[in-house]
């Protein structure tokens, strides 16, 4: 496509609009228009002084409009309107800007370079990207990230919490946003989400190429291993605190263990923080492996304590057994009150935290404040947790399994945790290993405890037998165990005696202070009397008569010789 521009009736310049030569043709033109000083050619002089190539909106790097760029101080071009109109312009008059735009002398047809400039963001954009591919990727996935169907819903969330955050008809609440148009505000308003109350299958996928585990944590040692995975003692690089990081042994994406891993995360998130439940901090996926960041318990597990006592030939004393039973019962009380059951209570899932108390630190103010004790027992490993109202039971260790669970009778699910707790305390008392099956297994399910080598009080032994009663209805709930007077008698006894001692010391100090003040007052009175001159008999008699309130008025008439 070729055209010509007439100047004074002659051919001034031939313009070539071929797509292949456009970029090469424009660059020399720019160089020629800005650096050429040829005076022999009137065309070159006109191009250099009056007709610079305008910058298109796609190539405008400074955010200026085409009109601002053309009228900038750097350019000598100033279009002068002609009285003759567009068609009657003088041969030497430069083209008007509107006429120049109609000719479309720049970026038409588009070349690969000009199309590339069109994909770049405008200079006024607030978000700066590192590259064009990242920008296009983010823009393409933004709608997918806003889709609520891709968000997991915790199946253990209480119904009251759901009703408080969602309309009864299942619609999301509208949350107005500032500085936004009305259309984004109604993004989720009045929009049905039928699957928002249903638990969806979450696929474990890693979104970042950099390992968060290696970046944020320094692995110290391996402290445990189980069927699900391994547990490592790690220190976080940011805060310098120790954490227990649990990592699955094998990839879980698409496997049957995937729901078990998610169930533990769901339970930890719903339960929150309790002094007798291992604290949960975070969870994420790396290379299809589930990683859970939990509280680090420096005392190990109850199973470790049992094995250590067995090697040394020692037993956990009865007072300590009662404290373990009480604290674990309080943890189960909290779990059961949340509508959940643990379903895998055993010594290896009860962890010990030993607090470093300073010398002279005040003891507990009461027996109910168990969180201030020097040793805390906490329930962990929530991989088998299920809901009481909607049970999806995954059987735990068969050695601690109640008979009704084996018969698939889920009407008294919390009592299964009580049965397992009774056997756990029995093992801590020194009983031998529990059977996995056969007649000895059924013998225990009939309400018989294994042999305990150390002597226990009849009351405590009867309580342990009640925990493993064959009828789940007869087993005491966790609420009753937490208030049991047999367990409460030993807990906080030292603190109670210390409190009474402090009260008696305070009373003694107050009495000593009053006695000292009385002695000082008595001594000062004697000194004042010794300094005074001797009194007459009349004054002494008068002072004596004033002592009695009833006698003062009657005896006053006898004084003075009246």
Curated annotation (Swiss-Prot):
It catalyses: L-tyrosyl-[protein] + ATP = O-phospho-L-tyrosyl-[protein] + ADP + H(+). Belongs to the protein kinase superfamily. Ser/Thr protein kinase family. WEE1 subfamily. Oocyte-specific protein tyrosine kinase that phosphorylates and inhibits cdk1 and acts as a regulator of meiosis. Required to maintain meiotic arrest in oocytes by phosphorylating cdk1 at 'Tyr-15', leading to inhibit cdk1 activity and prevent meiotic reentry. Residues 217-491 form the Protein kinase domain. Mg(2+) binds at residues 349, 381. It comes from Xenopus tropicalis. Residues 35-48 have a biased composition (Polar residues). This is Wee1-like protein kinase 2. The active site is at residue 344. Signal peptide: none annotated. Keywords: ATP-binding, Coiled coil, Kinase, Magnesium, Meiosis, Metal-binding, Nucleotide-binding, Nucleus, Transferase, Tyrosine-protein kinase. One of its GO terms (molecular function) is non-membrane spanning protein tyrosine kinase activity.
